[in-house]
Amino acid sequence: MIEVYTEHEQGKKWLEKHKNCCPIFACILGFTATGLIPRISAAGATPEDRKYTAIADAEFLIKGIKSDYQYPLPSLKKGVSPVFITRALVESLNIPIYLFNAGLVYPPPIPHIDLGGIAANCLTTGKALPLTTIRHLFQQGLHWGEKLAINAPNSYLIISECVVGGTTTALAILTGLGIDATGKVNSSHPQCNHQQKSSIVRTGLTQAEFYPILQPIDPFSLVGAVGDPMQIVAAGMAIAASRQTGVLLAGGTQMLAVYALIKAIIHDYQESANLEKIVVGTTRWVAEDPTGDTVGLAQGIGKVSLLATKLSFLTSECPQLRIYEEGYVKEGVGAGGCAIAASLSYGWTQEQLLEAIESLVNAKKELF
């Protein structure tokens, strides 16, 4: 149920080492005003909806099926939020959840850990976040990475995200780090909006006086210019956790950007990390997205093992899930990473995965 796409030897070793281990799940929430740009994302039908996507996903992740929510899941043009996949699996498998607010407009209405960050300005400003905030969030990431690793000895930590517009800030980080990512990233749209993303990124890097890129850019300054608050927390968390335990960066484009950021930070700031213990895990809808090139992107970053769950919705009775097979939604809130964990740690089959996810979707449908 798990495919290794790059760095096959490292990926297979990582999977073998963590087979039957019980993971911990961390989800880092963040917001960037980049997500409010018209048509930038399908994670919410309108810009107004997208203000609340991360908060609504977080509320559903923690509460599951309830009769009412403070922030109901926003309507999507097609399909359902990937949080249905994540919630179904963490609930069924009783995986511990740690929810982090790295920087949101509004705090989530459920128990969470506030890291003292702020929501990011649109990356087109070239001034997404103050450098003091970036440094603070990185230290918070290091602190919690070390703390969670202690709770997961001889196991692994799943680090996930929920940031609307995050594949665009990911493209900005990758581009700023000198990685050829144009035309290779993914999005929640069935056809990735590459031209729009590239134009936005060029504007932001130009405003920050980083474009054209003629020399290496300090990674902290880069995130401060065109990034989002999740990225630097995830990087710090993975760096610290990798010193003691395995790390599964659960996501596609966004977590590949985090991995590239990790490499830049440990190079520029001599932070110790064990990159052999860090892999990126996503869905096959991302890994095999014909409108992007996730595998090529991972190869361009270098020395990162890209894994993906083989989870399929082709035979699903739920049309909201079958639409994933047409390229809608694809990933988010650690959905791919949780499906990988279900197969790796608990031996779940395609049938078990589908049954758990469909049960949750149907329960929600019956209630409303």
Curated annotation (Swiss-Prot):
The superkingdom listed in its UniProt entry is Bacteria
The record, for SUPFAM superfamilies, names: Nicotinate mononucleotide:5,6-dimethylbenzimidazole phosphoribosyltransferase (CobT)
- Give an example GO molecular function: nicotinate-nucleotide-dimethylbenzimidazole phosphoribosyltransferase activity
Q: Which cysteines are joined by disulfide bonds?
A: none
Q: Which protein family is named in the record?
A: Belongs to the UPF0284 family.
Protein name per its UniProtKB record: UPF0284 protein PCC8801_3324
